[in-house]
C-alpha cells in the first residue's frame, strides 16, 4: 500500500500546499495547482498501486471459490477482498471519475483491454461489494488488528451513499453501524499516537510496522516531518485552514483540534521541541502523522509504524448530521454534530436553519478531519460554487466535476479506452 492519498485529499484542497523544497517533488506541485497532465508520476504511481490492490483482490475472490477450506473462513476472506476492492474503486472514482472496472483475475480474457465504466456504474459495484462485505466479523483478536470489519463495511458504504446524495440510504447504513455498539469518541489528542490508532473511535485504519524486512512502514513519518528531524516537510497547512478556528472552547482556550493537528510557531512540538514557523513554507506543519524520535530515530525516519486512520466514528457522526440536514431535519442534525463539537470543547449548536446548519457541518468537517485526506473530495461533492470559492483562481471547474487525467501509461496500453 502506497500512502499517497494526501497528495490529492490535502494538497489539491485549500487545507494544504505541497511544501518541501521548491524543486523537490515538482509533480506534486502540479497536483496542487491543477496543471497535472497524463504523464504525471504521482498520478501514474497512485493508479498502479491501486489497481495492484484490485488485482490481488480479484485473484482472491476468483481463486478461493473452488478451494476446499472452512466455509466460514472462505466467506470472510472473500468479504475482505471485496471490501478492499470497493475501497480502491472509491478512491479511483473520486480522483479520476470514469475508470476501467476490472472484476476478474489479471490473466482472464475478461480483464484485457477493459474500457471505461461510468461513475454511476462504478458506484453500483462499490455498493454491491460493500453489501456483500457486511458478513465480515464485527471484531478480531488483537493479533489481527487492521482487518476490515463489519463496521468498516457499513461505514464505507455510508460514505459511498453520501457521496451520491443517497442520504436516506446512508442513514440506514450508519444505523446498521451504530447498532453494533462498538464505536465511540475517544481523546482527540491521543488518536494519532502510536498504540492508540485502533481505539474505540477507529472504524478502519491502514496499519504499518517498523523494523520489518521487507518494509511495511509508513513513510509519512518522514515526508511530513521538519528537516531538523530528517524530514521533507511536505503537505504544509494553509493559513486558510488555521483561520477557521475562530470559535473558542467554553473555557476560552483554543479549539483543542488546532494544536493536535498541526505545529504552530511557539507551540509545543514533538521531541520536547518548540515549533518554529521557519520550518515550512506556510509557517505550519502537519502533526497528525508524525512520531517522536523516541519511537523512530532520525536515522530511520521513514520507517514509521503509525497507522493511517481512514474512517473513524467522528466522521460517521458528521455524515449523520449532514444526511439529516439534507433531508430537511436540521434539528435532528444537532445531536451528532454537538457530540463532535463537545469533544473539542465547543458549546452546543441549536435552532439553526437548514442553510446555517449546512455551513456549520461543512466547517466542522474541515476542522475535525483536517489532514486526514478527505477535504478535496468533500469540496468536489459539494459542487461548483463551494469548490471554486475554496480553491481560488488556479482552479477551473469542469462538468460534472473536476477529475485528474488518466495516466498516459494506461491510455497507451489499454486499447479498450477510446
Residue ranges and their predicted role:
Residues 1-28, 123, 127, 131-137, ...:
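An aromatic- and glycine-enriched ligand-binding surface/loop that stacks and positions planar moieties
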Residues 19-23, 40, 50-53, 125, ...:
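Long, intrinsically disordered, low-complexity segments
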Residues 30-31, 35, 246-313:
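Flexible, polar/acidic helix-loop-strand segments at domain edges
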Residues 51-54, 58-61, 78-79, 120-134, ...:
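Hydrophobic core segments within long, regular secondary-structure runs in both alpha-
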Residues 73-79, 141-152, 191, 350-353:
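A glycine-rich, coil/turn loop motif that links secondary-structure elements
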Residues 317-320, 327-346:
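Active/binding-pocket-proximal capping segment
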